[in-house]
Swiss-Prot record:
Record's GO cellular component terms: cytosolic large ribosomal subunit
HAMAP family cross-referenced by the UniProt entry: Ribosomal_uL15
Residue segments, region Disordered: 1-57
GO biological process: translation
Species this protein is from: Pseudomonas syringae pv. tomato (strain ATCC BAA-871 / DC3000)
Protein name: Large ribosomal subunit protein uL15
The gene coding this protein: rplO
Length: 144
């Protein structure tokens, strides 16, 4: 017996549907499309969101909100992510070098999430009150 001799057991695999290949298949003649109408024609699909000429939902509802450009150059960092930074001094550049934040980020804020395992010095990075307390409790300090 070789690999090219192997075949599935009879009846274990069903044949795929081939619409329009005879009435015995159950999908002959109309091929599962029904009789007449737009969806029976070739190319008879409608665009997503089209509601038959009625004003679509996305145009009935008012516009709202905007995309803040500030979000593009700001980032939040968890306490647990500070462990990825090598050395005792954490700056925006050291976070970029450790792939914790994107290269286009300019301002960072440290959030209280996770734990600090070692004393680190934070330079030029903002922090929440809880994160600041946790870093200082671990022996770390902040420098502006």
């Amino acid at each position: 017996m070789k690999l090219n001799d192997l075949s599935p057991a009879p009846g274990s695999r069903r044949e795929k549907h081939r619409p329009g290949r005879g009435i015995g298949s159950g999908l002959g003649k109309t091929g599962g499309r029904g009789h007449k109408g737009q969806s029976s024609r070739s190319g008879g699909t409608i665009a997503p969101g089209f509601e038959g000429g009625q004003q679509p939902l996305h145009r009935r509802l008012p516009k709202f909100g905007f995309v803040s450009l500030k979000a593009m150059d700001r980032a939040e960092v968890r306490l647990s992510e500070l462990a990825k930074v090598e050395g005792d001094i954490v700056t925006v550049q050291s976070l970029k070098d450790a792939n914790v934040i994107n290269q286009n980020v300019q301002r960072v804020k440290i959030m209280l999430s996770g734990e600090v395992t070692r004393a680190v010095t934070i330079k030029g990075i903002a922090a929440t009150k809880g994160a600041r307390a946790a870093i200082e409790a671990a022996g770390g300090k902040f420098e502006e």
